[in-house]
Amino acid sequence: MSNTPFRTGFVAVVGRPNVGKSTLTNALIGSKISIVSRKAQTTRHRIHGVLTREHEQFVFVDTPGFQTRHGGAMNRMMNRVVTQALAEVDVVVHVVEAGKWTDGDAKLLPLLPDARRTILVVSKIDAVKRRDELFAFVSKIVAQHPYDAVVPVSAVKSQQLDQLLDEIAARLPEGEPLFEEDTLTDRPMRFIAAELLREKIFRLVGDELPYGCTVVIEQWEETDKNLRVAACVVVERDSHRPILLGAGGVHMKRIATEARQDIAKLVDKPVHLEVYIKVRKGWSDRESALRDLGYE
């Protein structure tokens, strides 16, 4: 019997919008529980992803990007999610993009906890050709905050991920596992399905569609043999509907097909997915509407 104590705890993955937090979280867990797109602020909720190793259990909290430019109800809500996560977790992983330090990165620094539990992760290091450039970039950041450790990674190429996990594990408190060994997330499957559909929307029409778009699962009927899902895509304006549909419905057909395929992989059975569009004017700037649509 091993004398090594078991460690378990919560790990917040934070950073400015579109810096690679969800890609990193998915890579560490080894499964897709957070959606990814080129569009900033794709992650809106606090997502818990779970990884269990022989002597540790990591509960990763993938947070929305901390927003400093816009002050609408949704952005205020997402910033509350970030600040709450920072206050509650055992370890903070602050993700920055190699070679790209912005005002958004700098404005997050005062919110970071004391150094004993803060790790700086420099993502996308495969895009930096010279080591001296990377060293100079990191040196400027650590001069502004006393990080406990610095780990350069490439989530896409799986570089340095084990080293990052070891650094996190060393800072987790001793304790019993919080979840079963095979648990990947504490979010229900219908939540993940809604997120997968939203990801497809942002990937296909994100450049044309504003942020006032969300997905609500209105029907979820699962049997041993198959799953039937009815999903409502909520937009803010009538003009958003034709963007989503595309000429002859080609956009929506592709969005639904790709989402259905991903959901089928998730539940490991055939899926019938019905998607329709509803206009709810100004929902993203009303806190009551955000709560009605399942935002924290």
Curated annotation (Swiss-Prot):
GTP binds at residues 15-22, 62-66, 123-126. Its main location: cytoplasm. Residues 62-65 are annotated as: G3. Residues 41-45 are annotated as: G2. GO terms for biological process: ribosomal small subunit assembly. Keywords: Cell inner membrane, Cell membrane, Cytoplasm, GTP-binding, Membrane, Nucleotide-binding, Ribosome biogenesis, RNA-binding, rRNA-binding. Residues 7-174 form the Era-type G domain. GO terms for cellular component: cytosol; plasma membrane. The keyword GTP-binding applies. GO terms for molecular function: GTP binding; GTPase activity; ribosomal small subunit binding; small ribosomal subunit rRNA binding. It comes from the Bacteria. Residues 15-22 are annotated as: G1. InterPro entries: G_ERA_dom, GTP-bd, GTPase_Era-like, KH_dom-like_a/b, KH_dom_type_2, KH_sf_prok-type, P-loop_NTPase, Small_GTP-bd. It is found in: Cytoplasm; Cell inner membrane. Residues 153-155 are annotated as: G5. PROSITE patterns: G_ERA. Residues 205-281 form the KH type-2 domain. It is a peripheral membrane protein. Residues 123-126 are annotated as: G4. Pfam families: KH_2, MMR_HSR1. HAMAP family: GTPase_Era. Belongs to the TRAFAC class TrmE-Era-EngA-EngB-Septin-like GTPase superfamily. Era GTPase family. An essential GTPase that binds both GDP and GTP, with rapid nucleotide exchange. Plays a role in 16S rRNA processing and 30S ribosomal subunit biogenesis and possibly also in cell cycle regulation and energy metabolism. NCBIfam families: era (TIGR00436), PRK00089.1 (NF000908), small_GTP (TIGR00231). Monomer. This is GTPase Era.
